A protein has these predicted regions:
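Axial heme c-ligation environment in periplasmic c-type cytochrome domains
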Residues: 59-64, 85-118
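Bacterial N-terminal signal peptides
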Residues: 5-15
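Extracytoplasmic/secreted proteins, especially bacterial periplasmic and envelope-associated proteins
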Residues: 30, 34, 38, 78, ...
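Electrostatic cytochrome c docking/interface patches
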Residues: 16-38, 54
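Gly/Gly-Pro-rich "capping" loops immediately C-terminal to redox-active cysteine motifs
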Residues: 36, 52-80, 102
Length: 121
């Protein structure tokens, strides 16, 4: 039983995001400079100007976009879906609205490019 526990813990440790070696999908056609004002207008009210999720009026608290152990392992396609279709589309909070009707495909890619420029910790 002890060996099984050790093996299971080892498997969890090796497959955790901090140790994953997979390449994470990144878009190459987003423009962070164009995404900055879009982020400020549509995202910062909840996620904060610095991406740290400063809107403490929400429960659960808004996702911190600058946590290195989180954001570095999130594919751009996932972020695209969350922004375009809302949190519910990926099993997350319904408080995250769908911006696909407001933002173009390029706008969303630009916002993602801007998010990728935020300092992580």
């Amino acid at each position: 039983m002890r060996l099984l526990t050790i093996l299971m813990l080892g498997a969890i440790w090796l497959t955790s995001p901090a140790f994953a070696q997979e390449d994470v999908e990144r878009f190459t056609d987003g423009n962070a400079a164009n995404g900055a004002p879009l982020y400020k207008r549509y995202c910062s009210g909840c996620h904060g100007a610095d991406g740290r999720g400063g809107a403490h009026t929400f429960m659960p608290h808004i996702q911190n976009l600058t946590r290195k152990d989180y954001i570095e392992f999130i594919p751009d396609g996932f972020l695209y879906t969350v922004i375009a279709e809302g949190g519910v589309a990926v099993g997350k909070s319904g408080y995250m609205p769908a911006w696909g009707g407001t933002l173009s495909e390029q706008d969303i890619k630009d916002v993602i490019a801007f998010i990728r420029t935020l300092p992580t910790y």
